[in-house]
Amino acid sequence: MTMENQSIVQRALAGLIETGDVDALAPFLSDDFVHHRPGATTSTKVEWLAAVRAALVPLAGMQVEIHQVLTDGDHVVMYSRRWLPDAGPEIAVVDIWRIDDGLIAEAWEIIEPVAQVTANLAWWV
């Protein structure tokens, strides 16, 4: 089941990342889908898809480099780096997806500008 859950997330994101097709993402989300992000309100399926559509214009051309996709039971975790060619900072993103009955039921997203990582981890060294 773990690899099946990973495949669900990868197929859901493929159309969005490769072509910007938000409508291709919708069938992979449960009707009760909830999106969580620190410092932001929780979004329903309809609200989140609308936010993704609105973000596509300013984020057109965004490059996404997926570094890790890990699965544990009904959760899939993806670490990626994203950037806009010739604009804005590169960001590191961790997405956590919870799968329920073959659909994405919940998502969490942590975003950090890569340039801030060194400053934020100064205590680590």
Predicted regions and their residues:
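Short coil/turn motifs at secondary-structure junctions
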Residues: 85-87, 100-102, 112-114
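Hydrophobic pocket/interface hotspot
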Residues: 9, 24-25, 33, 48, ...
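A solvent-exposed, acidic/Ser-Thr-rich amphipathic alpha-helical stretch
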Residues: 22-73
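Short, cysteine-centered beta-strand-loop-beta hairpins and adjacent loop/turn segments enriched
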Residues: 57-58, 84-90
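Hydrophobic/aromatic beta-strand elements that line small-molecule binding cavities or substrate pockets
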Residues: 52, 64-70, 81-83, 92-98
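Short acidic-aromatic low-complexity motifs
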Residues: 2-31
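Low-complexity, intrinsically disordered terminal/linker segments enriched in charged
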Residues: 109-125
